[in-house]
Amino acid sequence: MQTFATPAPVAAVFGIPAGRVQIIAAERADTVVDVRPADAGKSRDVRAAERIQVTFHEGVLRVAAAEPANRFLGSSGSVEVTVQLPAGSRVEATTAAADVRGVGRLGDVTVDVAQGTVKFDETAAARLTLQAGDITVGRLGGSAEISTQKGHLRIDEAVTGAVTLSTQQGDITVGTAPETSATLDAGTAYGRVHNGLRNTVGASAALTIRATTAHGDITARTR
């Protein structure tokens, strides 16, 4: 476990091969990083955890795997990374197969995952990309591009900006705050569109939502 003094929000950059990343944001003046093997009884997970390098310089926290000496020795192993950091911090995560969980209020978030589940309580702007897996955001405070090839997308509350949601196979659910004016442009090849937005004012809307799926339903509603 490593601790860094961080009186202001930081930029956290993650690059792990597989496993789980948990980011816990709160009102605090330090950042704590804990890296563990996903299964302490598996040697490849232990080696994967040992390869994770943690650095902090000029407001940027990096948690990333060093390249193994031999890339062709089979599975790279899985790790569990938990980071506690100041609220409002920015996050960038890239991984082949991992679940990414954000607790508390974060700033701008960028996630690129081949396979896994992504869930955030609250973000500012977001760019979330999966090949396979579900994406959930509790409160989305800015513009976003959110997509998965196979999986469901759920935004409990979008506030402002341009939000683009797309999946090839899965349902899309998006909610807006009662005071938010919003418009919806939605399309599904095999499914239904349910538009329950109440505050729609055309081009002057504070929030524009574009949602598309090939196989699935699209539901939009004012909370």
Write out the residue ranges for each language-model feature:
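Right-handed parallel beta-helix
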Residues: Q2-A5, R51-A125, D134-V137, S204-A214, ...
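Short acidic/polar N-terminal linker immediately downstream of export determinants
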Residues: M1-R47, A69-T82, V193-A203
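Active-site alpha-helical segments that house and flank conserved acidic catalytic motifs
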Residues: F14-G15, A93, V111, I146, ...
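Short, surface-exposed interaction patches in beta-rich subdomains
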Residues: G138-R223
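Exposed beta-strand and adjacent loop surfaces of beta-rich binding modules
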Residues: A11, D30-V32, R51, R90, ...
